[in-house]
Amino acid sequence: MTRDEFDAYCKSLTATTNVVQWGGSSVWKVGGKIFTICSHWGPVDRDCISFKCTDHSYQVLCELPGVVPAPYLARAKWVQVQSNETLTDDDIKSYIEEAHAIIAAKLTKKQQRDLGLLPA
């Protein structure tokens, strides 16, 4: 998945905002809280996608080649996909959507309603 494809997909999710920070990283948020990042963090010389995941997904994904605990964020169960061969674009989109849902669920009910994540 290219950075442009990553940004386009994240933009399509409900109530998302984007900021470029931390050395040019594309940081996507819902309700002001980060759920995924496309960055050059780590040992590979290309953009890598990092996202929040469930405890189970974290364990499973970290066993795959090309997926590592995300730099600076691993303690919060974030992974970084460093290889395009490990997961398909559809897999990555699914995990990004799950990350969006995980972070959105941590917002207050009022915030969720205000952002259109819950019925009014």
Positions of predicted regions on the chain:
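Charge-dense, helix-prone N-terminal extensions
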Residues: 1-120
